[in-house]
């Protein structure tokens, strides 16, 4: 009965989650950013966003390379569909593993007892609309669920060592490997994977096993970190640098929590889960076939760490730590997204719950009936809340408006802005303001140009490329090929709709190394905390830098000053670390200077940057005459 009811619950939740996620299928602009990198990988340009500039534009390393493999296997299939399929499958797999892990947690105490397994925490998670939104989206959210579900299931198995069978070194190595990969799934998951590895090291009974844990858990993340430092010249992805993950915005973080909680009253299931968990702990048995006796080199602390209660504390503590991390960061601009993983962790111990049928063995029948009644009542409360929350209007009228909080329902925002209920491909985003016009502008400038967004959604401001009048560059060299660059915030939809030879740059620093090294603005919209002036972009390229070649709202003096500021030796070193050809010498130099490059910041006002760097302020022409 227990096993049948567990699998029925798993199947029911997976079907509901899959159906609900498919009804809200989409690919986010940030998801398209990842696909631009995958396009470059498939084209042989390396893991970059723009050719000739080594920027790690994606937070999840594992998700990037998983999509790369999927795109390679998929061949002619559109990358958007590959991302959609992988995200959906991994989301469902994560939910299945969560429930199987929780079922395994309770299984030993249910041996020989009659019980029905019912979904509880799993229902809560899939009822929250953002959980179904980000089950697709093209972001790493599905991979996050699959990873957390797998780690939870494996940690539960590890916490239940059998007396009749010694621990398998293969399983131990696999668990250490999975825990070590946490930082490749998302950088902040190092808190989760690191804690799991520490628990394993404490419980390990021999030095040989400790060495195995360290090697299996540390080899891949350490190897990739060395690659990141040498190839990108940074300690962290460019996305972390752009959002200054070392900073804190506690007040904005609390606004984000409130924004996530208010539409769904999330406190209700969380409050109900506490007495539910306590009742389940009261009713559980201590089965004799688990290892309860002392063993050589296996002391009290090791036994306490390698136990189901410790693993429950681990997953709940991980959820709390992740939530605190994101609250400190200020949350995100996407409604609910970054709090889904903490919620998933907090609900894991009650993903499914056993309803014990009274048998008079451990409790009197009357006590057993009271216990069943209490558990059933709490479960009905959770199920009722789930039904209500699943049909919640969410953020309501504010879902598609960028209000003072800076938080929007990203799926609804892009559905409204593109006119597509399910924006799935880059072509769907051509109906987003300015997107169709950018293709026209690129086709109309065969000699090369920098495109700046204008106030008119149907046109772009153009800055021509400097071309030698004789057709040859100084010194008799052939003239440079026409180049195009586009300066825009939505670099995902833009990057996927233009060729890989078009440089796509942003002002917030996700794909622009110059913007990434500016200071974080204190009161800016969360996730968009940096804002590089377009004057820098004109100065940092082969573009005309004087009137009338530049738009009237650009200050030519600022362009001149920005061009001079780019000659700052430290700034040139940072830019050369990602733009100079990668050689062994460059790689080793980047490794040695990656800490310095990660900490380096410039002032976004060119004049102030010149003063900071100790350079002379050049004399330049004033603004253009006004008619």
From Swiss-Prot:
Enzyme Commission identifier(s): 2.4.2.-
Keywords: Cell wall biogenesis/degradation, Glycosyltransferase, Membrane, Signal, Transferase, Transmembrane, Transmembrane helix
GO CC term (a single one): membrane
GO molecular function: glycosyltransferase activity
Membrane topology label: Multi-pass membrane protein
Biochemical pathway: Cell wall biogenesis; cell wall polysaccharide biosynthesis
Tagged with keyword Repeat: no
Signal sequence residues: 1-28
Parts of the chain that traverse the membrane: 81-101, 115-135, 138-158, 183-203, 211-231, 263-283, 307-327, 338-358, 370-390
Main location, first listed in the record: membrane
InterPro entries (alphabetical): AftB-like, AftB-like_mycobacteriaceae
Membrane found in the keyword field: yes
Biological-process GO terms, alphabetical: capsule polysaccharide biosynthetic process; cell wall organization
NCBIfam families: beta_arabfuran_tase, flag_mot_ctl_ZomB
Job of this protein: Involved in the biosynthesis of the arabinogalactan (AG) region of the mycolylarabinogalactan-peptidoglycan (mAGP) complex, an essential component of the mycobacterial cell wall. Catalyzes the transfer of arabinofuranosyl (Araf) residues from the sugar donor decaprenyl-phospho-arabinose (DPA) to the arabinan domain to form terminal beta-(1->2)-linked Araf residues, which marks the end point for AG arabinan biosynthesis before decoration with mycolic acids.
Family: Belongs to the AftB family.
Listed name of the protein: Terminal beta-(1->2)-arabinofuranosyltransferase
Lineage: Bacteria, Bacillati, Actinomycetota, Actinomycetes, Mycobacteriales
Name of the gene this protein is made from: aftB
């Amino acid at each position: 009965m227990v096993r049948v009811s567990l699998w029925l619950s798993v199947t029911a939740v997976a079907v509901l989650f899959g159906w609900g996620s498919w009804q809200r299928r989409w690919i986010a602009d940030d998801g398209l950013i990842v696909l631009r990198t995958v396009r470059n990988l498939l084209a042989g340009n390396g893991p970059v966003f723009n050719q000739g500039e080594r920027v790690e534009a994606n937070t999840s390393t594992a998700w990037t390379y998983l999509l790369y493999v999927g795109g390679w296997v998929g061949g002619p299939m559109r990358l958007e569909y590959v991302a959609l399929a992988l995200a959906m499958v991994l989301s469902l797999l994560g939910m299945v593993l969560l429930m199987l892990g929780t079922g395994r947690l309770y299984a030993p105490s249910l041996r020989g007892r009659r019980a029905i397994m019912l979904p509880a925490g799993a229902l809560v998670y899939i009822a929250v609309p953002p959980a179904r939104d980000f089950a697709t989206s093209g972001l790493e959210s599905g991979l996050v669920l699959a990873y957390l579900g797998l780690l939870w299931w494996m940690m539960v198995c590890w916490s239940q060592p059998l007396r009749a069978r010694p621990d398998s070194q293969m399983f131990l190595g696999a668990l250490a490997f999975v825990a070590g990969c946490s930082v490749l799934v998302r950088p902040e998951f190092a808190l989760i994977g690191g804690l799991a590895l520490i628990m394993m090291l404490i419980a390990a009974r021999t030095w040989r096993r400790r060495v195995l844990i360290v090697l299996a858990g540390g080899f891949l993340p350490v190897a990739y970190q060395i690659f990141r430092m040498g190839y990108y010249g940074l300690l962290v992805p460019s996305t972390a640098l752009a959002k200054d993950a070392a900073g804190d915005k506690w007040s904005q973080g609390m606004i984000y929590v409130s924004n996530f909680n208010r539409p769904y009253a999330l406190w209700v299931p969380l409050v109900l889960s506490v007495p539910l968990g306590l009742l389940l702990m009261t009713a559980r048995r201590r089965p004799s076939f688990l290892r309860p006796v002392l063993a050589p080199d296996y002391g009290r602390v090791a036994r306490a760490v390698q136990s189901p209660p410790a693993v429950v504390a681990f997953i709940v503590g991980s959820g709390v730590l992740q939530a605190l991390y994101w609250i400190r960061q200020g949350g995100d601009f996407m409604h609910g997204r970054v709090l889904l993983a903490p919620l998933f962790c907090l609900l894991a111990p009650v993903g499914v719950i056993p309803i014990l049928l009274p048998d008079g063995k451990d409790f009197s029948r009357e006590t057993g009936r009271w216990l069943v009644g209490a558990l059933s009542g709490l479960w009905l409360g959770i199920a009722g809340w789930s039904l209500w929350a699943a049909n919640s209007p969410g953020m309501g009228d504010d879902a598609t408006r960028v209000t003072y909080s800076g938080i929007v329902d990203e799926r609804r925002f892009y559905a409204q802005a593109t006119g597509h209920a399910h924006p799935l491909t880059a072509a769907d985003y051509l109906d987003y303001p300015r997107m169709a016009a950018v293709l026209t502008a690129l086709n109309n400038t065969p000699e090369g140009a920098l495109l700046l967004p204008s106030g008119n959604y149907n046109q772009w401001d153009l800055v021509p490329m400097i071309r030698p009048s004789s057709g040859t560059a100084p010194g008799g060299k052939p003239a440079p090929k026409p180049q195009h660059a586009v300066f825009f915030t939505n670099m995902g939809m833009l990057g996927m709709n233009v060729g890989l030879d078009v440089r796509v740059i942003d002002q917030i620093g996700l794909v622009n190394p110059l913007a990434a090294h500016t200071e974080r603005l204190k009161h800016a919209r969360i996730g968009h905390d940096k804002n590089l002036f377009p004057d820098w972009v004109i100065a940092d390229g082969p573009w005309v830098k004087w009137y009338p070649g530049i738009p009237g709202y650009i200050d030519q003096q600022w362009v001149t000053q920005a061009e001079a500021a780019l000659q700052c030796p430290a700034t040139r070193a940072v830019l050369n670390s990602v733009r100079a050809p990668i050689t062994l010498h460059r790689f080793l130099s980047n490794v040695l200077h990656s800490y310095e490059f990660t900490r380096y910041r410039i002032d976004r006002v060119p004049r102030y940057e010149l003063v900071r760097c100790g350079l002379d302020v050049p004399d330049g022409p004033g603004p253009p005459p006004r008619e």
